[in-house]
Amino acid sequence: MTDKSIKELALSVGRPVEKLLEQAREAGLPQRTADDIITTEQQDTLVNYLKKVHGQESGNTGKIALKRKTTSTAKVASTSGKAKTINVEVRKKQVFAKPNPEQIAAEAKARAEAEAKARAEQQAREAAEQKARLQTEQKAKATLDAMRAAHQQDSAAQSAPKAAVVVKKRGGGTVKPAPKPAETLEQKKAREAQTAQLKATEEAARRKAAEEAQQRTLEQMRKMASKYSNDDATATIRVIDDSPLASGLVGQAYEDSFNQEDREIKRGGATTNPRAGKKGGRRGQEEQSFVNHNKRGLKSSQANKHGFEKPVKKQVYDVEIGSSIVVADLAQKMAIKVREVIKTLMKMGELVNQNQTIDQDTAALVVEEMGHNPVLVSDTQAEDNLLEAAEEARGEQTTRPPVVTIMGHVDHGKTSLLDRIRRSKVAAGEAGGITQHIGAYHVETDKGIITFLDTPGHAAFTSMRARGAKATDIVVLVVAADDGVMPQTAEAIDHARAAGTPIIVAINKMDKESADPDRVLNELTTKEIVPEEWGGDVPVAKVSAHTGQGIDELLDLILIQSELMELKASAEGAAQGVVIEARVDKGRGAVTSILVQNGTLNIGDLVLAGSSYGRVRAMSDENGKPIKSAGPSIPVEILGLPEAPMAGDEVLVVNDEKKAREVADARADREREKRIERQSAMRLENIMASMGKKDVPTVNVVLRTDVRGTLEALNAALHELSTDEVKVRVISSGVGAITESDVILAESSEAVLLGFNVRADTAARQKSDQDGIDIRYYSIIYELIDDVKDAMSGKLAPEHRETILGVAQVREVFRSSKFGAAAGCMVMEGVIHRNKPIRVLRDDVVIFQGELESLRRYKDVVDEVRAGMECGLAVKGYNDIKPLDKIEVYDVQMVKRSL
């Protein structure tokens, strides 16, 4: 650093001049203006001050961090029962701080004092132990000598009478020894007791000597370990001492030393000479013993630590069972092989494989049979907990706008009526003039906010109407005044009743001359819809979407009904709602239409819908205008879910991503189990139905639509087209553009590729042109259904239709050498053809069926003979013709059938 002005210094460090002057003043520097010069020493002073202020010490911290990363692999069990290999990465970090010199000197001095004190204490302890050991040995030796002397005296006293005493006789002969006195019982018992006491004393002395030898060995190993731990040059040994390796080595050395001394004591010899050994001296023996048993100690430690311990008794598990469970998953929870579970199920009369699903009761019986404890749990426990937590976080409830669903028959003017209310032109933009998915709108009228759901009226959209009735507060039933109650009108009434939703009848098209509202009311009465003016409880409004007649009256009825229902919701807490519709847009991903029912939905919220979850990245209203939040009864479109959820799925905002993932995975697993169960049931039904029957022609379909609701409706409609003679099978269906994989699938399965309100991408078009696959696009649902019907009709076998061309009566029978029996006939009706099949009838009963061999008029061979004329004919291969028989000529035509 060099001397420079405050302004130059501020420019070099990138800080404002005023801020730098303020910091210099706080550091005690004299500079006050931007042109003042600051020296190098003053710059150092300023830097040290700033470091101190920000919690940093000037100078080096004296710390060093060591990091180590190791990677290994491990095998774990998966849900399928097979082991899979995963990578395990272990990261270690250790920070060493360098102490200052004063601290090092103080620690060295304290360590030296502690070592000197410990050494003095150790020497004093060893001297005391040596003195005590000598005293103990002397006492034991004195006691042992005294007992041996007493024992010898007793033995001498007992053996004295046994000695042979030789006495010379007076006559020069010898005297015989005195006879041996008999040992009494008391003397025998005393001798045995004395012997036992002597043995016990010797055993006690031997045991005490062994304990002292073991203590000496332990002290030797302690000194050796202390030597290694105090050696600065071998600092790494301190780390190793705490490891299982060091424990095994030292422990094995202790054990070997004790065993050696025990063997020497039992042999009656002294302990090993401490000065013996190759290195000489006590230390040499210790180190040699430590080195010799290094390898054996390692093996012993590892064997003791990782040895298998056999279980004392069978493990009993608490097995959690939901409403259904896969056999393989059940076996894994009980830690047994799948075949054991299958055997148990076979004993119970159930024939299943490892991938099949069994119900909760059957699984509980299997678990009890296998000796474990079944725990019955709810599949929706996690979802219920989330809902309860969301309800607890709700604030005060306030009045919310009503949600009104417009329902009725196709072309009765539902969307046009909603257009008049919204003052827009939605119906003109619908393909074919009919609504093909649920439209959600909220309308701000002079009388308040109303949210409308416009449902399709076509027969194929039954599930959509059912969802609309379930998510609504009020149903407006639109009936055309000139058409009356139709099938979808009656279906809408049933949906509204099933959902328990009040109904308001709107008789539309009152501006037409053919309008007959009384007939409509009579037909509604047959469906138990009695209007208020007839003494019932159903409000009726006579409206015209074309002229606007009765619109205000209809809105008043809706708002009055909502006030009577006291609709309330909380605008606070996590949002909760229902999926109205979902689609996949190119470049945007999954677009989900949601009706918020409780709480407030904000951008950035974590949304759980069906088996998918994600954060709201963007949100817009029904007109495509971006918004940041939406309250109760407001329909919105959101982006952020990884895939399009099913229409009708419940939507919930959660705070914990882990819980959202758990609930989504649980829902996906339940859906998978249901699909497996459904497929297995279908396979069984197909096997039973196909027994004894020939193959049925099938029309394969690959279907792609723009929204989920339309996909569901088309799947149901195509499934209902199947008959006993020809089937419709949807190979694949999905939401979004037609892709190359769809074209490949259609080619391999010989399927028809249909797109509803979607188009094929570039790769799919190129592939279809290359392989000659026809892609059909539709925007009106009944046109798609009609084309599939035509394809099914092409698979039907043609019908054989017979037409009687003419009838001739036999008048006389002649014999011919060439033809045999020849009949002279009169043509009664029609025309007799020579090359057409015939039947011979006798008393109006068919007795022969064949063809003519010859047809003549007089002597001429002719091709046909008309009514009222005579002819002669011969039947090929039949000679039993009699008078009054009838010859019937007919023709068989192949007629193409249609559904």
Swiss-Prot record:
UniProt-listed Gene3D superfamilies: P-loop containing nucleotide triphosphate hydrolases (3.40.50.300), Putative DNA-binding domain, N-terminal subdomain of bacterial translation initiation factor IF2 (3.30.56.50), Translation factors (2.40.30.10), Translation initiation factor IF- 2, domain 3 (3.40.50.10050)
Originating species: Acinetobacter baumannii (strain AYE)
Protein name listed in UniProt: Translation initiation factor IF-2
Molecular function per GO: GTP binding; GTPase activity; translation initiation factor activity
Positions of region (G4): 508-511
G2: annotated span: 433-437
Entry keywords, A to Z: Cytoplasm, GTP-binding, Initiation factor, Nucleotide-binding, Protein biosynthesis
Residues annotated as domain tr-type G: 399-568
Any Pfam family matching the protein: IF2_N
Family per similarity comment: Belongs to the TRAFAC class translation factor GTPase superfamily. Classic translation factor GTPase family. IF-2 subfamily.
Residues holding GTP: 408-415, 454-458, 508-511
PROSITE patterns: G_TR_2, IF2
Region (G1): 408-415
Main subcellular localisation: cytoplasm
Location within or outside the cell: Cytoplasm
Superkingdom in the source lineage: Bacteria
Function: One of the essential components for the initiation of protein synthesis. Protects formylmethionyl-tRNA from spontaneous hydrolysis and promotes its binding to the 30S ribosomal subunits. Also involved in the hydrolysis of GTP during the formation of the 70S ribosomal complex.
GO cellular component: cytosol
Region ranges (G5): 544-546
Record region (Disordered): 116-135, 170-189, 262-306
NCBIfam families: IF-2, small_GTP
SUPFAM superfamilies with a match to the protein in the record: Initiation factor IF2/eIF5b, domain 3, P-loop containing nucleoside triphosphate hydrolases, Putative DNA-binding domain, Translation proteins
Region (G3): 454-457
Encoding gene (name): infB
